[in-house]
Regions:
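Gly/Ser/Thr-rich phosphate-binding loop
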Residues: 281-283, 301, 310-313, 323-395, ...
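Conserved ATP-binding/catalytic segment of the ANL
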Residues: 416-476
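Structural core segment of the AMP-binding/adenylate-forming
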Residues: 2-11, 119-192
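Conserved AMP-binding/adenylate-forming core of the ANL superfamily
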Residues: 35, 59-115, 132-142, 193-197, ...
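Conserved AMP-binding/adenylation subdomain of ANL enzymes
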Residues: 237-258, 265-332
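Conserved pre-ATP/AMP-binding loop-to-beta segment of ANL
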Residues: 55-58, 176-178, 185, 191-218, ...
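Conserved AMP-binding A3 loop
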Residues: 71-76, 205-206, 214-241
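Conserved structural elements of the adenylate-forming
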Residues: 79, 83-85, 195-201, 210, ...
Length: 542
């Protein structure tokens, strides 16, 4: 059965057309009746296209601080740097077996170096900077380096990464590249970007196919060692083709796409959804040096005062902090709502009170409600599997399957486990055949481990709602995964002997909480109370 949402804003989005086929085994196949149109051969074709069609348009912008002007690179200049850096990549013999690894945060050089490798069929792998900058044992960083055996490792500057680079030095034979020309202990990226373009670049670019590996993105590692998810060119281009078919405003004459984004390129939301959205559609991405964290969001707000995004992306925690600022800053509120076509949240569920607050502020500023949309997927689905390309009635609607992607809903206890199949789904994990085999069912659907419910089982066009994990792990509203089993054990150990057991909570919230079952005997002993002391006295003793 197919239904059309009467609230669909046709000027922005395509109307969903979804069927749900119920099978004899109890499973439900959910898909779009809109066929996926032909995708680009590779993401390099997008860069080549926009360098011809809009050579002077700003592709990327960044700034060192809120006090300095934006440094930018046009599509034409970006392509020139990509081709020249690709000449160096080829000269060093980089390949899927010896890829480019990037340890630093988002930046123009980061983007151009990654694109240069991908342009000639060499995967890049952006590793979470936290593995280098916040770890003491560097175990996760070491495991990624050992798995990938990189041919080159890029950092924006060697000084902050000195300890991490020293820790992994025995594990690789890579050239260390720095974005800072003053780093004497590394090859400077500006020198690489000035490499004379080799005729081999055009040949290597022509040899790239949809099956060529574009990048490796690592899972969070919340349940163990991070896994390297293979991202092919087909995954990335088909995902953005589906996005263009659902976000139809992207291809309307005169459409302008400007985003200001902090989301890290070591994760699929920032790297594959947002960055590739800009590249595929000839937009402009201003790199936000802030983030929704204490002491850092002021930078994001300053950047919002400088750049007016046409689409705003964030995780729920980011919206929480933004709303607080919009309530007190009239000028920022006006500029934000006048410029944004809609807002997009993902990474975790958006609390309804934040949804309501954003709508209220929008009405105050411009007299209409700002559309709020979302999507759902994972690193393994690059990431788009469903998209809420309609006006949902409330927060939490993750939308419907994108064109070309099928969902299989499998009964699992009192939940419907959701599985995914389509050109956007990974072929597997790098050098992990057992993990790859275990990740798919006998029909080739990826077992993501999430559960969903229909907004209305009779009207699949009205979307799906995330219904938790089939297993026990969950996300905070920052998008951070919480490893429940690991944290429970660590919490009990930290509180020993006072905690008998712990229930870990916090799904969709801004922090983790423990529901503690006390060891009353230990509590009485610590407080110096007799065994006859009651529970309230034992746990309430100062």
């Amino acid at each position: 059965m197919t239904a059309v949402s009467g609230d669909n804003p046709n000027s922005l989005f395509a109307t969903p057309a979804i069927v749900a086929d119920r099978r004899g085994d109890g499973s439900i196949l959910v898909r779009s009746t809109t066929p996926l149109q032909e995708s680009a051969r590779c993401i390099g074709d997008w860069l080549e296209h926009w360098a011809r069609q809009a050579p002077d348009r700003i592709f990327l912008g960044e700034r060192a601080s809120v006090e300095t002007p934006w440094s930018t690179v046009s599509y034409r200049d970006a392509l020139g740097i990509v081709r020249q850096a690709a000449s160096w990549v080829l000269s060093q013999g980089l390949s899927a077996e010896r890829p480019l690894v990037i340890l630093s945060d988002n930046g123009i050089d980061h983007a151009l170096f990654a694109l240069s490798a991908q342009h000639v069929g060499v995967p890049s792998a952006a590793i979470s900077p936290a593995y280098s900058l916040m770890s003491r044992d560097f175990d996760k960083l070491k495991s990624t380096i050992e798995l990938l055996d990189p041919g080159a490792i890029y950092v924006a500057s060697t000084k902050p990464f000195a300890a991490a680079l020293a820790a992994i030095k025995p594990l690789h034979r890579a050239v260390i590249v720095s974005g800072n020309p003053e780093d004497a202990d590394a090859l400077a990226f500006p020198a690489i970007a000035a490499t004379p373009e080799s005729p081999d670049v055009a040949k290597a670019f022509a040899a790239v196919t949809p099956d060529t590996i574009a990048k490796f993105l690592f899972t969070s590692g919340s349940t163990g060692t991070p896994k390297a998810v293979i991202n092919t060119q087909r995954m990335l281009t088909s995902s953005q083709q589906a996005k263009a078919q659902t976000w139809t405003f992207l291809e309307q004459p005169g459409a302008e796409l400007v985003i200001l984004d902090w989301l890290p390129w070591s994760h699929t939301f920032g790297a594959n959804h947002n960055f590739n959205l800009v590249l595929r559609n000839g937009g402009t991405l201003y790199i936000d040096g802030g983030k929704p964290a204490p002491g850092l969001f002021a930078t994001s707000l300053a950047n919002l005062r400088s750049v007016v995004p046409t689409v705003y992306f964030n995780v729920p925690r980011g919206f929480d902090m933004l709303i607080a600022a919009l309530r007190t800053d009239d000028e920022l509120r006006r500029k934000f709502f006048e410029g944004a076509k809609f807002a997009f949240y993902a990474g975790a569920a958006l609390p309804q009170n934040l949804w309501d607050a954003l709508e209220e502020l929008s009405l105050q500023a411009v007299g209409h409600r700002l559309p709020m949309v979302s999507a759902w997927g994972s690193t393994e689905t690059s990431p788009l599997a469903t998209d809420c390309h309609f006006l949902a009635k409330r927060s939490g609607n993750i939308g419907v399957p994108i064109p070309g992607t099928e969902l299989k809903l499998v009964p699992s206890g009192d939940k419907l486990e959701v599985r995914v199949r389509g050109p956007n789904v990974t072929p597997g994990y790098w050098k992990a055949p057992d993990l790859t085999a275990a990740a798919f069912d006998d029909e080739g659907f990826y077992k993501i481990g999430d559960a969903v419910t229909f907004a209305d089982p009779e009207w699949p066009d009205l979307g799906l709602f995330f219904d938790g994990r089939v297993a026990e792990d969950f996300k905070l509203n920052s998008g951070t995964w919480v490893s429940v089993g690991t944290l429970r054990v660590a919490g009990i150990a930290a509180l020993a002997p006072l905690a008998q057991d712990i229930v870990v909570t916090g799904h969709g919230r801004d922090h983790v909480r423990f529901l503690v079952f006390p060891n009353l005997a230990a509590c009485r002993s610590l407080a110096g109370l007799p065994e006859s002391a009651d529970t309230r006295e034992a746990i309430g003793h100062p």
